Curated annotation (Swiss-Prot):
Subcellular location: Cell inner membrane
Pfam families: ExbD
Transmembrane segment boundaries: 23-43
Species this chain originates from: Pseudomonas putida (Arthrobacter siderocapsulatus)
Keywords associated with the record: Cell inner membrane, Cell membrane, Membrane, Protein transport, Transmembrane, Transmembrane helix, Transport
Membrane topology: Single-pass type II membrane protein
Domain of life assignment: Bacteria
Protein name as it appears in the record: Biopolymer transport protein ExbD
């Protein structure tokens, strides 16, 4: 006859696992807070740039203009540049190889900023570091 004696211990086994439910609840609340707050941090700010009050620099006898039209066509003076890679060669022809010549850069207001920077980088790669940006003089008189 077998007799089973209870030695006074608990019948429930101890649970050695970590309860992650409160941790998940806190993480979900933080996720929701950041999802709501993130769009507020990326508000577009309208910047109305001031007009320059500086006096216009004297114009050289034969200025060299690089222009970007609204249709994304690039010109050196009145001559269209067939490819952006040929900009340096056309500038060399206009300036007779003088890299110290100031290049006047003008662009239509509808041209993307990235396209402007690409043209500026092409001029810099060709060795033309003196670049003047051309704007409307009437904007400075407001």
């Amino acid at each position: 006859m077998g007799l089973h004696l209870n030695e006074g211990g608990d019948d429930l086994a101890e649970n050695h696992e970590i309860n992650v439910t409160p941790f998940i609840d806190v993480m979900l609340v933080l996720l929701i807070i950041f999802m709501v707050a993130a769009p507020l941090a990326t508000v577009d700010i309208k910047v109305d740039l001031p007009a320059s009050t500086a006096k216009p620099a004297p114009r050289p006898e034969k200025p060299v203009f690089v222009s970007v039209k609204a249709d994304q066509k690039l010109y050196v003076g009145d001559d269209q540049v067939p490819a952006p890679a040929q900009l340096g060669a056309m500038l060399d022809a206009k300036t007779k190889g003088d890299k110290e010549t100031t290049i006047f850069f003008q662009a239509d207001k509808g041209v993307d900023y990235g396209d402007l920077m690409e043209v500026m980088n092409n001029m810099r790669a060709a060795g033309y570091l003196k670049v003047g940006l051309v704007g409307l003089e009437t904007a400075a008189k407001k």
